[in-house]
Swiss-Prot record:
Record-linked PROSITE patterns: RNA_POL_BETA
Keywords from the UniProt entry: DNA-directed RNA polymerase, Nucleotidyltransferase, Transcription, Transferase
Any one GO molecular function term: ribonucleoside binding
Organism superkingdom: Bacteria
InterPro entries referenced in this protein's UniProt entry, alphabetically: DNA-dir_RNA_pol_bsu_ext_1_sf (IPR042107), DNA-dir_RNA_pol_bsu_external_1 (IPR019462), DNA-dir_RNA_pol_su2 (IPR015712), DNA-dir_RNAP_su2_dom (IPR007120), DNA-dir_RNAP_su2_hyb_sf (IPR037033), RNA_pol_bsu_bac (IPR010243), RNA_pol_bsu_CS (IPR007121), RNA_pol_bsu_protrusion (IPR007644)
Family: Belongs to the RNA polymerase beta chain family.
Protein name: DNA-directed RNA polymerase subunit beta
GO BP: DNA-templated transcription
EC number(s) on file: 2.7.7.6
Entry GO CC: DNA-directed RNA polymerase complex
Lineage, broadest ranks: Bacteria, Pseudomonadati, Pseudomonadota, Gammaproteobacteria, Enterobacterales
Biological role stated in the UniProt entry: DNA-dependent RNA polymerase catalyzes the transcription of DNA into RNA using the four ribonucleoside triphosphates as substrates.
Length: 1342
């Protein structure tokens, strides 16, 4: 395997056995591709903005004299970049400009001619843009639009599974779901009549919709029924026989022909009888009259002479009518063929309960259901029905819907009209009748072939279309009235409805969510999340168990492990590692093609629908070197079931063992040894890990760490290969390799790093370079580590030395005992940044003022403020300290005579304002690391704002000047090379200033041209530099666009350093979570025979019942990895020969059975071996891929190689007594995470505070500074103890006895420690509530 320069720094030993066939795809592609489709002009008009415009335009006026046509659109440039938008609280968006054409027609009697054409570009609002990392910046906060898994448009056949009716009868239904438009449902009732519902309104007999489609009774019966023809010959009734129709019936007479009896009376007709009738070619049989009576006639029989209807279709035959028909010469009678087995009389029965008898009455009936209370007119009823399913404006099945519709009805063609037609409705009714008759099956709603993914682009397009439709109405009216000659397209369009619809979607839709930015994994998982909730989806309350459950089609598409616990379980899922969506929005997963037992490298992506037709082998099936299956019988999946198949029957094979899990679950080592519930918790808790100050890669990983770190966008990744030319904490400069340079460019890439910024979860985002000067790097190499990454690998926690043993009850109930050394070494220390803002508004009484002149505040409180009233950077503040001094004018109050006198003498006006300063919230303390001031246009900037502006300008100028110098020096290197080739002395050149170099006289024409070219390049560079500085200067100095009524906003950023402490929550990666119970001194911790103490003591009882054995294997393998690292460290310290070091590390990498990883250290230079050894001395990092990890014997090999007992258990000594513990203890290294559930954020105490308005009881919760509720059960406890006075105190003065608590306060002030309980306020509330019911209660004192 070839390693790049940076990969050689630390190689992860891989225990994977299966060869890597397919690289992990870019993990954010679902977001980026979808949005790209939305904003990129699509010439076919199928997707994005183009599709939205084409579906609404052209807009015609009501009179048809004019129309507004769409030509094209373009997106403008963004005003601010991503970082500026975040700082200013702006939306990162671009203006949408659309070219429209207004065409005015001249109407003659015969034809319309074009009178005038006007074309103009029209502004249509702002479209939020996606950042490179798949997020949106909306009002300064980073948000993610989660993809939605919804029911695909099309037709679905389902049943109620016998739950609706008390008899338990299964009622079938069909539903046609369009992409937009009215739903059409068909359903059976318990009496087997078929009904139709439009948009879930009142049900109507299905015949009504058939009549509305212009079918009469006779035609309806013709469509849905087969006919029996009875002929009257010689006063006998003869049935034209179709033998198959007799199956299952009991003969009510002898079936005979030509004297031969084929079936005796009373016998059941079997397949044998039918075959006999067929063999003897019997076409007709004579039947008794009783057999025809009660049959239903399939057409109208009319007396030709009088025109009188003797019997109408769908009526039962009686003896009299039979006689009548015979008299009038009708010798052939058609009846409906029905039976109870597989030809039910459902439509015929339904026609009987239908009151309508022609098209008009059916349309009126539909109109009454859809628009109750409105008078139906012929035109209105026809329009309504036409618009429901047959108008492209109101109804759209979409290409996906049509494809699913046609597939469901087993049609060959998958394309067609996007509206419904007569045949569609009739075919659906036929299929549901077939299902009721026992032919065909109902669909599985939870099959991923019936659910599709709607991503950002598609949802944004739908919202945009809604906005356009709102505009369309207004445009139609404007086109129909007034003088069009004077109007331009600009005057027609109002952009507000469009931008409002888009803004509403991105700002407040259920699927546009505040990004979870705890760590890189939580970001990536959030972007890959798939939700069944949201607009057009399910609701938590109504979602049943089936929808939430794992379905066989989830395999390789949706992760069966990662889903939240609680009410959303199963409704919010995560995309599997290799899954992607196809053009129709269905999820597909890759498989390797297999032919006759030979596995090829060819890869096909299959959707859930396609997968059902194939036999698919698992990824861990044994294959020989040539690619053939070694076993004759192979475990495979087929139609959702697992079983053994012959190797030659197999069609496909899984690509990888981690194909079925999501990114989060693929980071858990040994999940094959964990219970599923615990793996779920492990996957979820990794997302809550807080980035630590010192990052530490996991010793035991899965090989996915690098992919997550690189794709998440938190690291700086090289765009092109080159050499590191300059590196410091805030920027990295790369000199690009010549072969990757564009023509006429300086060949320099500059990467500016993010320093100490706040994330959405108040954690700290900080990038640190991980390359050194002069290092060669390749495209895709990691240059700088972000939060929770270590040398380009995801590092969410720390490798801790753990022991599984009880320790004085401090690990009871999953508690965790931690060594003081962990705190001293800052292993779990994290930085949290909080943003506090102070807004100065213009009030009715005057403007609020930010100043340090605050009434009734002592000098000490103002000591950290500058003269503008704003805290200085670097100040250490605690709860209650003033950060920004602000005073608000208050209304004139009635003054007492004394105050009036004082006013008159001293002219004091200070009491006109009240203190409304920004203070540090309770329980928060930290250091001020940044202050930002935003001032409205036209408001004078204060001194501090100008200072900040100055500082920003200086910094930007310095940055840009440095950038310019880097580019310039690269240019002059080129020029120098040219001069050297002309034998010009470089010493002379160095004495000249740079600008003069271009004026050196050169004789050779080609070289002269080259120098001129470079001179031009230098000039362009300088111009661009000046332009950049000017743009930045304007952005900084211009006033800010603030909300109405806001004059100034001051934002203060506080950084808090939090060490780990008792009460903090910690967890491993296997769902093994707990709370720290005690930080124990190092000397008291258990230690081994070498005197090394353990860092953490965990409870061994937490393992067996939870069945997460993965943590034990991780601990053992971690111990081996660390042991090997210790040996390498020892070799480095004793300065062993490099050749010996190389041999030892090579041996370590070669350990294990038939590994796919082949590391050849002979290709490494001595320097590279030393650097590798230094990075391995803390433990050799190991990768054990999901479901393909290290085996038990391999772990033992590793332990043996490290010189450790293969049991993984060692003798420990008690730190306090020095005595041996009585048995060996499992000790090893486990990767532990500190979760974002810190005791500092949870701990809270109340003395006095605010009270609820109605009940006068203290509020609850930390945010309201509330108290602890003393509830019903707590009252019982005090009653049980007989503590009557304490109880009285709790229920009165400490709760809601208003007078009592005021008196008590006064008593305490006076030093009199007594209380007088009175009536609790809640009792008065109860009295008032009872009185509101009309019952009067009065309290009488005895």
């Amino acid at each position: 395997m070839v390693y790049s320069y940076t990969e050689k720094k630390r190689i992860r030993k891989d225990f994977g056995k299966r060869p890597k066939v397919l690289d992990i795809p870019y993990l954010l592609s679902i977001q980026l591709n979808s949005f790209k489709k939305f904003i990129q002009p699509d010439l076919s008009g199928q997707h994005g903005l183009e599709a939205a415009f084409r579906s609404v335009f052209p807009i015609r006026g009501y009179n048809g004299n004019s129309e507004l046509q769409y030509v094209s659109y373009r997106l403008g440039e963004t005003i601010f970049d991503v970082k500026e938008c975040q700082i200013r609280g702006a939306t990162y968006s671009a203006a949408l400009r659309v070219k429209l054409r207004l065409v005015i027609y001249e109407r003659d009697i015969l034809e319309a001619t074009v009178k005038d054409i006007k074309e103009q570009e029209v502004y249509m609002g702002e479209i939020p843009l996606m950042t490179n990392n798949g997020t949106f910046i909306i009002n300064g906060t980073e948000r993610v639009v989660v993809s939605q898994l919804h029911r695909s448009p099309g037709v679905f056949f389902d049943s109620d599974k016998g739950k609706t009716h008390s008899s338990g009868k299964v009622l079938y239904n069909a539903r046609i779901i369009p992409y937009r438009g009215s739903w059409l449902d068909f359903e059976f009732d318990p009496k087997d009549n078929l009904f139709v519902r439009i948009d879930r309104r009142r049900k109507l007999p299905v015949s009504i919709i058939l009549r509305a489609l212009n079918y009469n009774t006779e035609e309806i019966l013709n469509i849905f029924f087969e006919k029996n023809i009875f002929k009257i010959e010689n006063n006998k009734i003869v049935l034209e026989l179709v033998p198959e129709r007799l199956r299952g019936e009991t003969a009510s007479f002898n079936i005979k022909k030509n004297g031969i009896i084929y079936v005796e009376k009373g016998r059941r007709i079997t397949a044998k009888h039918i075959q006999e009738l067929k063999n003897n070619k019997i076409k007709s049989i004579t039947v008794p009259v009783e057999y025809i009576l009660g049959r239903i006639v399939s057409k109208n029989y009319v007396d030709k002479k009088t025109g009188e209807t003797i019997i109408s279709s769908n009526t039962e035959l009686s003896l009299e009518i039979l006689e009548k028909l015979k008299k009038l010469g009708f010798y052939s009678i058609e009846t409906l063929f029905t039976n109870d087995l597989d030809h039910g009389p459902y439509i015929s029965e339904t026609l009987r309960i239908d009151s309508s008898n022609d098209r008009m009455s059916a349309l009126i009936e539909i109109y009454r259901v859809m628009r109750p209370g409105e008078p139906p007119t012929k035109e209105a009823t026809e329009n309504l029905f036409e618009n429901l399913f047959f108008s492209e404006d109101r109804y759209d099945l979409s290409t996906v819907g049509r494809m699913k519709f046609n597939r469901s009805l087993l049609r060959e063609e998958t394309k067609g009209s996007s509206t419904l037609n007569k045949e569609d409705i009739i075919d659906v009714i036929k299929k549901i009748i077939d299902i009721r008759n026992g032919k065909g099956e109902v669909d599985d709603i939870d099959h991923l072939g019936n659910r599709r993914v709607r991503s950002v682009g598609e949802m944004a397009e739908n919202q945009f279309r809604i906005g356009l439709v709102r505009v369309e109405r207004a445009v139609k009216e404007r086109l129909s009235i007034g003088d069009l000659d004077a109007l331009m397209p600009q005057d027609m369009i109002n952009a507000k409805p469009i931008s409002a619809a888009v803004k509403e979607f991105f700002g407040s839709s259920q699927l546009s969510q505040f990004m979870d930015q705890n760590n890189p994994l939580s970001e990536i998982t959030h972007k890959r999340r798939i939700s069944a909730l949201g607009l057009g989806g399910l609701t938590r309350e109504r979602a049943g168990f089936e929808v939430r459950d794992v379905h066989p089609t989830h395999y390789g598409r949706v992760c069966p492990i990662e889903t939240p616990e609680g009410p959303n379980i199963g409704l919010i899922n995560s995309l599997s590692v290799y899954a992607q969506t196809n053009s129709h929005g269905f999820l597909e997963t890759p498989y390797r093609k297999v032919c006759n037992g030979l596995v090829s490298e060819e890869i096909h992506y299959l959707s859930a629908i396609e997968e059902g037709n194939y036999i698919i082998a698992q990824a861990n099936t044994n294959i020989d070197k040539t690619g053939f299956f070694t076993d004759d019988l192979v475990t495979c999946r087929h139609k959702g079931e697992s079983s053994l198949f012959n190797r030659n029957q197999v069609n496909y094979m899984d690509v990888s063992t981690q194909q079925i899990v999501s990114v989060g679950a693929s980071l858990i080592p040994f999940p094959e040894h964990d219970d599923a519930n615990r793996a779920l918790m492990g996957a979820n808790m990794q997302r809550q890990a807080v980035p630590t100050l010192k990052t530490d890669k996991p010793l035991i990983g899965t090989g996915m760490e690098r992919a997550v770190a690189v794709d998440s966008g938190v690291t700086a990744v090289a765009k092109r290969s080159g050499v590191v030319q300059y590196v410091d904490a805030s920027r990295i400069v790369i000199k690009v390799d010549e072969k990757e340079m564009y023509s006429r460019e300086a060949g320099i890439d500059i990467y500016n790093l993010t320093k100490y910024t706040r994330s959405n979860q108040n954690t700290c985002i900080n990038q640190q370079p991980c390359v050194n000067l002069g290092e060669k790097i390749k495209k895709g190499d990691v240059l700088a580590d972000g939060p929770s990454t270590d040398l380009g690998e995801l590092a969410l926690g720390q490798n801790m030395r753990v022991a599984f043993m009880p320790w004085n009850g401090y690990n009871f109930e999953d508690s965790i005992l931690v060594s003081e050394r962990v705190v001293q070494e800052d292993r779990f220390t994290t930085i949290h940044i909080q943003e506090l803002s102070c807004i100065s508004r213009d009030t009715k009484l005057g403007a609020e003022e930010i100043s340090s002149d605050i009434p009734n505040v002592g000098e000490a409180a103002l000591s950290k403020l500058d003269e503008s009233g704003i805290v200085y950077i670097g100040a250490e503040v605690t709860g209650g300290d003033i950060l920004v001094g602000k005073v608000t004018p208050k209304g004139e109050t009635q003054l007492t005579p004394e105050e009036k006198l004082l006013r008159a003498i001293f002219g004091e006006k200070a009491s006109d304002v009240k203190d409304s300063s920004l203070r540090v919230p309770n329980g928060v303390s930290g250091t001020v690391i940044d202050v930002q001031i935003f001032t409205r246009d036209g408001v004078k900037k204060d001194k501090r704002a100008l200072e900040i502006e100055d500082m920003q300008l200086k910094k930007i100028k310095q940055d840009l000047t440095e950038e310019f110098k880097i580019f310039e020096s690269s240019l002059f290197t080129h020029i120098k090379k040219t001069f050297i080739s002309l034998d010009i002395e470089t010493k002379q050149l160095d004495t000249l200033p740079f600008e003069k170099w271009f004026s050196v006289d050169i004789k050779q024409k080609d070289k002269k041209k080259e120098i001129e070219k470079l001179a031009k390049q230098h000039h362009e560079l300088k111009e661009e530099f000046n332009k950049k500085i000017e743009i930045k200067r304007q952005k900084i100095t211009q006033g800010d666009d603030l909300a109405p009524g806001v004059l100034k906003i001051v934002k203060v950023y506080l950084a808090v350093k939090r060490q780990i402490q008792p009460g903090d929550k910690m967890a491993g990666r296997h769902g093994n979570k707990g709370v720290i119970s005690k930080i124990n001194p190092v000397e008291d911790m258990p230690y081994d025979e070498n005197g090394i103490p353990v860092d953490i003591v965990l409870n061994p009882l937490g393992v067996p019942s939870r069945m997460n054995i993965g943590q034990i294997l991780e601990t053992h393998l971690g111990m081996a990895a660390k042991g090997i690292g210790d040996k390498i460290n020892h070799m480095l310290k004793t300065q062993e020969k490099i050749s010996n070091l190389r041999k030892f590390i090579q041996k370590a990498f070669d350990l294990g059975d038939n590994l796919r990883q082949k590391v050849n250290l002979d290709t490494f230079s001595n320097e590279e071996i030393l650097r590798l050894a230094k990075n391995l001395k803390n433990g050799i990092p190991i990768s054990t891929p999901v479901f393909d990890g290290a085996q038990e014997n391999e772990i033992k090999q590793m332990l043996k190689f490290a010189g450790l007992p293969t049991s993984g258990q060692i003798i420990l000594f008690d730190g306090r007594t020095g005595e041996k513990f009585e048995r060996p203890v499992t000790v090893g290294y486990m990767y532990m995470l500190k979760l974002n559930h810190l005791v500092d954020d949870k701990m809270h105490a109340r003395s006095t505070g605010s009270y609820s308005l109605v009940t006068q009881q203290p509020l609850g919760g930390k945010a309201q500074f509330g108290g602890q509720r003393f509830g019903e059960m707590e009252v019982w406890a005090l009653e049980a103890y007989g503590a009557s006075y304490t109880l009285q105190e709790m229920l009165t003065v400490k709760s809601d006895d208003v007078n009592g608590r005021t008196k008590m306060y006064k008593n305490i002030v006076d030093g009199n420690h007594q209380m007088e309980p009175g009536m609790p306020e809640s009792f008065n509330v109860l009295l008032k509530e009872i009185r509101s019911l009309g019952i009067n209660i009065e309290l009488e004192s005895e």
